[in-house]
């Protein structure tokens, strides 16, 4: 659906042990391959590969790279996550290298937007992701996780099905009012 590949820092940008940089899109594997010491082309989905981010043959950081192949990913696109050391400098440098090699900086919420537009999650689940990020207590987090699991959709599904049947019947009556075998709507 999308013809570009996006990248962003997925963890808070602060000094810490680990930072994660996420890349999603058709060219995710190719772009990460351009800066990674190992070839991900033939690696299995949901695998982790140890290696180095390199620039001009010199190591930039020691990393673990997680590979998730479409469609079994959050965005339903190929997704690669680089787990690097958590300093702000090295995290930004790796992101910059990805952008220089063809990725585009993701907008805030764009990974979830792609998950929604690619049919991975529905609107209530997309909203719940933000609710989870903003949750400040157990009750709010619990409500958000139930929404992410699709409990609202499951609750509403019988009503949605009934409405879809009603719409179909109305459309048949509009399109074929002269046929006797079509149940008349009043």
Language model feature labels by segment:
Residues 1-142, 146, 150:
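A glycine-rich (often HGG/GG-containing) alpha/beta subdomain
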Residues 2-9, 13, 141-186:
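C-terminal-of-GTPase-core extension/linker across diverse P-loop GTPases
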């Amino acid at each position: 659906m999308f013809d570009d590949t996006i990248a962003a820092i997925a963890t808070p940008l602060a000094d810490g042990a680990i930072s994660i940089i996420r890349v999603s899109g058709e060219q995710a594997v190719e772009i990460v391959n351009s800066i990674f010491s190992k070839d991900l082309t033939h690696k299995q989905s949901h695998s982790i590969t140890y290696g180095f981010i390199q620039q001009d043959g010199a190591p930039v950081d020691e990393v673990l790279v997680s590979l998730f192949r479409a469609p079994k990913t959050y965005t339903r696109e190929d997704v690669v996550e680089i787990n690097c050391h958590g300093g702000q400098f090295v995290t930004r440098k790796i992101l910059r290298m990805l952008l220089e090699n063809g990725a585009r900086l993701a907008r805030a919420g764009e990974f979830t937007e792609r998950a929604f537009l690619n049919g991975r999650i529905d609107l209530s689940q997309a909203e719940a992701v933000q609710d989870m990020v903003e949750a400040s207590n157990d009750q709010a987090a619990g409500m958000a996780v139930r929404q992410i699991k699709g409990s609202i959709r499951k609750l509403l599904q019988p009503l949605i099905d009934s409405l879809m049947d009603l719409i179909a019947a109305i459309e048949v009556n509009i399109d074929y009012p002269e046929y006797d075998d079509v149940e008349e709507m009043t």
